[in-house]
């Protein structure tokens, strides 16, 4: 390992705030007891031990689920049709299932194509009864004749067994289709049959459900063939499972899929990723709905007692994990990762879920924390904050006990992280204070500016963050380079003797998360991926931190021009060696001096050719994003994790860490209007009406400037606009004056302008020229 990528020794200031080796070792041994955060490649049975696996005790109730007394329920609008709102503004790890939690997650791509599982001989299938065209013609005939017999007979035969399902929907009944890339299913035919099903008479729909019951009973035991997997794949898409009256059947289908072996899950995952976006999203929404209505049933009497079906939710969560992994294997994903959030979970006891997960070694109980992709970022923030609060309370309690045991008078200041800094020496004072008080980093933060009166009720803390961030990220400071093309900062590769200020930035980000402060920082997504590599500080100091697999796409988020050039090199159809005349040596300017670096031993003598260009691009990208800034980023990493040393970080995706630190880029000005408070104005006053007419009509860039002008950031906290506590105050000055913002209190002081035109003009001038005016 070269010097550039060596982990700093324990004697360096980088790890001064990290836990002691003995403490880390103890914590690491505790974390080994945690259940793995489930990926589709993992075992299928997590949490399924709540219910009996050897028998299907509730299948006897299947028939009652489709009996005539349920017809009214099937016809009316069911709670199962509600659509859960996605938490917007918010790729596990890709962030969750692919590469961020290396110890907990398994990429499906890492598995071999056949998983080395024995391929069972496929049974001889019945003769395929109809084609898509035949089925559609039968449906058309019904419109004129009203006779459903042909359609009824088709559904009766098709859903009677797994072989019949394959006979109906397999592209070629004689072909095996034992590959992960092609399920062999005629998707168009499946979609046509299911789209028609909900418009058929009730007796046809009951016939299908009874056929599924028979199929599941018949196929409950024994090894699975690929035809069995195809049948599960087809049945899972049945839209009848939107109705709560079918949930008993649906639950047993989910359990059979969840308990398949890993090799079978591997096939299903790759088949799922071939679904259309519409059908894929329907599967996800149906499963989320199933979990929500099992947790909070509109009519509890529709379901078996929870004690007899405690395996329902674990089974659904496991199948969701398969879909989540499939989604992460597609670039871009079929649906946004936020579509997997289940907002219903925001209303359960999240800390109980978290503690169950933490204590898994003792209880082996199911916890949603094993499936963090269904937990919204807002819910994860609650878990992190409450976990940190508990840590703060424990530290403060120990401090009080120590004081009392020494017969010293307790000082309430020991409950806080008290920062005393001079404005003229902001960075050095802050660094000194945080270094001296590294044991107090998890306490509530309070800031005092030396020589200034006033209590910190939140405003001074926010001002300290804003001033410090602006100073550290200023180009003249030299720690970070601002890339105009990508509008983001990246770590300077300049070598120095002390990287403690990078540790300070990491601590600031950690404190911001724990103290609910939104920072005006612009790092690329790659930064947060590195920050979770690994999500917990390793006990072995020799293990590199902040190193992750990077691609040209990651580089494009920082240096788009260079990334474009490397992409052209990869796609060049001519002779790369003659046309580009490059070697495995790169150059960087440091303080006006050009320095050369070999990407591999003897790189200056190795030409880039058509054969090795992929290696060159990978090494160059890795050099820029990992090796050349290793010491800087390691200091930053240790700083962040010295504050955020919590297992809760294992629940987060890189994008979610960014949202916790910087807020969401998606604005909802109507929500801001609803939550705004007024001082000196009423929301019915003419000036206020003018203000909102103007602001709601602003283009997005001006709305962001307004938010930045009034709050110090153009992003929204995790809790939404309401968490800003935005206030408009009446400024009793001349209407010739511009609006004034008290950034630390998210307050806008607005003169009583007499016309909308005047207000718009003054507001645009104010928000467009606020840089350099300083904080008020």
Curated annotation (Swiss-Prot):
Basic and acidic residues: compositionally biased ranges: 21-34
Active-site feature positions: 744
Pathway, per record: Protein modification; protein ubiquitination
Modified residues (Phosphoserine): 9
GO BP annotations, alphabetical order: protein polyubiquitination
Name of the protein in question: Probable E3 ubiquitin-protein ligase HECTD2
Skewed-composition ranges (Low complexity): 7-20
Annotated spans, Disordered: 1-46
Pfam family, any one: HECT
CDD domains: HECTc (cd00078)
């Amino acid at each position: 390992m070269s010097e550039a990528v060596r982990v700093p020794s324990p004697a360096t200031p980088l790890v001064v705030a990290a836990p002691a080796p003995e403490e880390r070792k103890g914590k690491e041994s505790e974390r080994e007891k945690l259940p793995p955060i489930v990926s589709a490649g993992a075992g299928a049975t997590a949490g399924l031990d709540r219910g009996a696996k050897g028998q299907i005790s509730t299948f006897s109730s299947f028939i009652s689920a489709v009996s005539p007394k349920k017809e009214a329920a099937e016809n009316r609008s069911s709670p199962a049709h509600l659509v859960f709102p996605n938490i917007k503004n918010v790729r596990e790890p890709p962030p969750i299932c692919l590469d961020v939690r290396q110890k907990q997650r398994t990429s499906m791509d890492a598995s071999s194509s056949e998983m080395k599982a024995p391929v069972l001989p496929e049974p001889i299938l019945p003769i395929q009864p109809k084609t898509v065209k035949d089925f559609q013609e039968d449906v058309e005939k019904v419109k004129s004749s009203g006779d459903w017999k042909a359609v009824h007979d088709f559904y009766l035969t098709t859903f009677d067994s797994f072989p019949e399902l394959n006979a109906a929907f397999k592209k070629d009944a004689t072909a095996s289709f034992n590959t992960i890339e092609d399920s062999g299913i005629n998707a168009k035919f499946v979609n046509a049959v299911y789209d028609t099903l909900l418009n058929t008479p009730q007796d046809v729909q009951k016939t299908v459900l009874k056929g599924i019951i028979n199929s599941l009973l018949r196929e409950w035991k024994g090894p699975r063939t690929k035809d069995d997997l195809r049948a599960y794949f087809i049945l899972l898409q049945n839209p009848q499972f939107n109705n709560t009256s079918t949930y008993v059947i649906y639950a047993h289908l989910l359990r059979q899929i969840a308990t398949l072996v890993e090799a079978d899950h591997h096939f299903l995952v790759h088949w799922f990723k071939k679904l259309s976006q519409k059908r894929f999203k329907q599967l996800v929404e149906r499963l989320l709905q199933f979990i929500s209505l099992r947790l909070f049933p509109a009519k509890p009497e529709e379901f078996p007692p929870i004690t007899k079906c405690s395996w329902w939710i674990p089974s659904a969560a496991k199948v969701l994990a398969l879909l989540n992994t499939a989604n992460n294997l597609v670039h871009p994903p079929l649906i946004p990762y936020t579509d997997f959030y289940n907002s219903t979970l925001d209303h359960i006891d999240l800390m109980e879920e978290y503690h169950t997960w933490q204590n898994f070694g003792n209880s082996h109980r199911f916890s949603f924390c094993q499936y963090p992709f269904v937990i919204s970022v807002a819910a994860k923030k609650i878990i992190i904050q409450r976990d940190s609060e508990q840590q703060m309370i424990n530290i403060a309690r120990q401090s009080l006990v120590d004081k009392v045991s020494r017969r010293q008078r307790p000082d309430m200041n020991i409950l806080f992280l008290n920062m005393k800094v001079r404005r003229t020496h902001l960075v050095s004072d802050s660094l000194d204070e945080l270094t001296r008080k590294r044991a107090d980093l998890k306490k509530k933060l309070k800031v005092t500016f030396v020589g200034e009166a006033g209590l910190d009720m939140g405003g001074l803390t926010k001002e300290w963050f804003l001033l410090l961030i602006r100073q550290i990220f200023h180009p003249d400071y030299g720690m970070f380079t601002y890339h105009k093309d990508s509008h983001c900062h990246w770590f300077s590769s300049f070598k120095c003797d002390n990287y403690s200020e990078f540790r300070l930035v990491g601590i600031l980000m950690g404190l911001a998360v724990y103290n609910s402060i939104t920072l005006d920082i612009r790092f690329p997504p790659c930064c947060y991926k590195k920050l979770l590599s690994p999500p917990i500080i390793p006990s072995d100091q020799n293990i590199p931190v902040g190193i992750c697999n990077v691609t040209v796409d990651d580089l494009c988020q920082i240096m788009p021009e260079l990334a474009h050039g490397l992409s052209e090199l990869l796609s060049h159809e001519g002779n790369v060696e003659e046309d580009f005349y490059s070697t495995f040596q790169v150059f960087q300017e440091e303080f006006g001096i050009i320095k050369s670096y070999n990407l591999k031993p003897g790189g200056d003598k190795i030409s880039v050719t058509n054969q090795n260009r992929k290696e060159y691009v990978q090494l160059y990208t890795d050099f820029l994003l990992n090796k050349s800034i290793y010491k800087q980023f390691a200091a930053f990493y240790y700083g962040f994790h010295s504050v955020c040393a919590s297992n809760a970080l294992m629940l987060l995706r890189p994008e979610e860490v960014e949202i916790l630190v910087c807020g969401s880029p998606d604005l909802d000005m109507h929500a801001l209007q609803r939550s705004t408070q007024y001082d000196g104005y009423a929301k019915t006053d003419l000036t206020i009406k003018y203000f909102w007419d103007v602001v709601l009509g602003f283009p997005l860039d001006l709305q962001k400037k307004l938010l930045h002008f009034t709050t110090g950031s153009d992003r929204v906290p995790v809790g939404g606009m309401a968490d800003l506590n935005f206030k408009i105050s009446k400024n009793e000055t001349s209407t010739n004056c511009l609006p004034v913002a008290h950034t630390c209190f998210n307050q806008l002081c607005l003169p009583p302008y007499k016309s909308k035109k005047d207000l718009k003009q003054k507001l645009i001038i104010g928000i467009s020229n606020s840089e350099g005016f300083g904080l008020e």
